[in-house]
């Protein structure tokens, strides 16, 4: 299979999966997007889902954001640790920049997993994402 494809098993598809990741995951904020990250149960897999509300803009703007995020994920999927990610856009009608999103993926996701591991270790396996503050990217 071509290395830059995005097969179905690399995508988060069901509402139940999205809810699990956003509720139990660690929030990381980049310059272009907000990521919720949880470790993956299956070794060798990194999965991603994208959520863009209608507040972001018209359909072509939402689709454009999703297209760029999917393309970035295709390029960095093999560099990321085993995890499940849900991506939300940051800001309204902000046009995504490929290079900034690429840096956000490479920097924020491993850091979020590292912090999630620390949080679970200190609280005995429980993670309360609502009480945790989001990790913000340096400006």
Curated annotation (Swiss-Prot):
Alphabetically ordered keywords of this record: Endonuclease, Hydrolase, Nuclease, RNA-binding, tRNA processing
EC number: 3.1.26.5
BP terms from Gene Ontology: tRNA 5'-leader removal
Gene Ontology MF annotations: 3'-tRNA processing endoribonuclease activity; ribonuclease P activity; tRNA binding
Catalysis performed (reactions): Endonucleolytic cleavage of RNA, removing 5'-extranucleotides from tRNA precursor
Entry's Gene Ontology cellular component terms: ribonuclease P complex
InterPro entries in the record: Ribosomal_Su5_D2-typ_SF, Ribsml_uS5_D2-typ_fold_subgr, RNase_P
Region (Disordered): 120-139
Organism domain of life: Bacteria
A Pfam family this chain is assigned to: Ribonuclease_P
Family: Belongs to the RnpA family.
Protein's job: RNaseP catalyzes the removal of the 5'-leader sequence from pre-tRNA to produce the mature 5'-terminus. It can also cleave other RNA substrates such as 4.5S RNA. The protein component plays an auxiliary but essential role in vivo by binding to the 5'-leader sequence and broadening the substrate specificity of the ribozyme.
Subunit structure as annotated in this protein's UniProt entry: Consists of a catalytic RNA component (M1 or rnpB) and a protein subunit.
Protein name: Ribonuclease P protein component
């Amino acid at each position: 299979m071509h290395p830059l494809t995005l097969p179905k098993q690399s995508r988060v598809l069901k509402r139940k999966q999205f809810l699990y990741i956003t509720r139990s995951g660690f929030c990381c904020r980049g310059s272009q997007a907000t990521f919720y990250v949880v470790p993956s149960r299956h070794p060798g897999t990194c999965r991603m889902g994208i959520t863009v509300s209608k507040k972001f803009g018209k359909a072509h703007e939402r689709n454009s954001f999703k297209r760029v995020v999917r393309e970035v994920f295709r390029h960095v999927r093999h560099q990321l640790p085993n995890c499940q990610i849900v991506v939300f856009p940051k800001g309204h009608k902000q046009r995504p920049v490929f290079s900034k999103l690429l840096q956000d993926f490479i920097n924020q996701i491993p850091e979020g997993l590292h912090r999630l591991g620390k949080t679970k270790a200190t609280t005995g396996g429980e993670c309360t994402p609502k009480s945790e503050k989001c990790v913000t990217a340096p400006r």
